[in-house]
Curated annotation (Swiss-Prot):
This is Sensor histidine kinase YdfH. GO terms for molecular function: ATP binding; phosphorelay sensor kinase activity; protein dimerization activity; protein kinase activity. Signal peptide: none annotated. It is an enzyme of class 2 (transferase). Residues 1-25, 68-78, 121-125, 172-407 are cytoplasmic. GO terms for cellular component: plasma membrane. The gene is ydfH. The chain crosses the membrane at residues 26-46, 47-67, 79-99, 100-120, 126-146, 151-171. Residues 201-402 form the Histidine kinase domain. It comes from Bacillus subtilis (strain 168).
């Protein structure tokens, strides 16, 4: 994912050198203007310039400043061309000066060397040598033998100060760019975490509502169908019994729904012994559907609340699917742990079975999807086997985060 440029989106977003040049545009332009004004004042004070030379000097300085202003555009492919042109312009400007006033132009050479520090990488040494060569030629042309030592004594400190300032400036710009990019990456990561948190919370809400309200309503619907059949046959006593069971089931569903809503508001509390909850769930299904439910519980470790809660809802969803879709007569539930600290959960029925691949792709059936999401939420592994007319078997393996119980 692209990170927005701290200065301008349209510029080279990830090019540190281009950003350095962007940061240098205004202070660099001010420095060039200072060189221009100082050169004009000194030459006119000495009385050694004509109007024609003034025009030529002004035009060259303007071109130099214009190229500097757009230096960020030269970074990627035309770095050598940029410094070659700027070096020649500086060379020409120095030749327009007279006598010792070439010291003013030293500032432009030092300025270009400072730009090389922030703009060029592998070709830095070559470009610096190129500019120093031009400076030596300028100095040799303008200075007499007796002036060379004075020139070096004055010019060297000036260049060192300007180059040091440029290096410090670019180092500060680099740190600022890194800080801004880091801040933007952190903000982006924070937004992504918020989005993922919201998405996960929505998925959890969908699972909880499905595992409470949807399962309860499915069970109630089956009981109402049974009541209708018994009333049609005149078996009012049995219909009354099922109505009583339905009322209990409605109360239980309401309680589960409230528990799910409370869970959205606060952290999950301990849900009790898993075996007792599964047994209670099986009793409800036996009463409402007439199915036979067999439990093989050989768990020796205490499950954390999250794992126990998800296992409970997975079993409930499997039983609902077996009653609603598979038309099963018997359900076998097995729970055990192994020596490697893993929980094994198997739910098997003798229903009509189904095509597993088509079942995974079928839209609108949140049961299988909900099981997969719950298994993923507890870092488990999920496997489903189904054969037509022979039933379905769901196998789940989950790492246990608990301690061994005392025998």
């Amino acid at each position: 994912m692209l990170i927005r440029n701290p200065f301008k989106d349209k510029y080279y977003s990830h090019d540190r050198r281009a950003l350095n040049m962007l940061a240098l545009r205004v202070p660099g332009l001010a420095f060039i203007l200072m060189i221009y004004i100082a050169s004009i004042v000194l030459q006119f004070v000495s009385g050694g310039w004509s109007i024609l030379l003034l025009y030529a000097f002004t035009i060259l300085i303007a071109i130099f400043a214009l190229l500097h202003w757009h230096s960020y555009r030269w970074v990627k492919k035309r770095v050598i061309l940029y410094f070659a042109v700027q070096g020649l312009i500086t060379f020409a400007l120095a030749n327009l000066m007279t006598g010792f006033f070439i010291l003013v132009i030293i500032g432009l050479y030092a300025f270009l060397i400072g730009q090389i520090i922030g703009m060029a990488d592998r070709r830095r040494t070559f470009l610096i040598l190129y500019l120093l060569l031009l400076l030596v030629i300028n100095s040799a042309y303008h200075l007499h033998k007796g002036e060379v030592l004075h020139f070096i004594v004055i010019a060297a400190p000036i260049m060192i100060v300007i180059i040091t300032y440029a290096a410090t400036f670019f180092a500060q710009v680099d740190e600022k760019i890194k800080a801004q990019l880091t801040l933007e990456r952190l903000e982006l990561a924070h937004q992504q975490v918020e989005q993922l948190t919201l998405q996960n919370e929505r998925q959890r809400m969908a699972r909880d509502l499905h595992d409470t309200l949807a399962q309860g309503l499915v069970s109630l619907n089956m009981q109402l169908d049974a009541i209708h059949v018994h009333l049609a046959k005149g078996n009012t006593e049995r219909a009354k019994e099922i109505i009583q069971q339905s009322m209990k089931r409605v109360k239980s569903t309401i309680a589960d729904a409230r528990s799910a809503i409370d869970d959205l508001r606060s952290k999950s509390e301990e849900i009790g012994v898993l075996k007792e909850r599964i047994t209670s769930l099986m009793d409800h299904f036996i009463e409402s559907t007439g199915m036979a439910c067999l439990l093989d519980y050989r768990l020796h470790q205490v499950l954390d609340v999250r794992t126990a809660e998800n296992c409970y809802y997975i079993i409930g969803e499997c039983m609902t699917n077996a009653a609603k879709h598979a038309e099963a007569k018997t359900i076998w539930i097995s729970i055990w742990d192994d020596e490697k600290g893993r929980l094994h959960l198997t739910v098997k029925d003798n229903g009509k079975g189904f095509d597993v691949e088509k079942g995974k792709k079928k839209r609108g059936h949140y049961g299988l999807l909900g099981i997969q999401e719950r298994v993923r939420a507890i870092n488990g592994q999920f496997n489903i086997k189904s054969t037509k007319l022979k039933g379905t078997q769901i196998e789940i393996t989950v790492p246990i985060q608990g301690e061994m119980q005392d025998e």
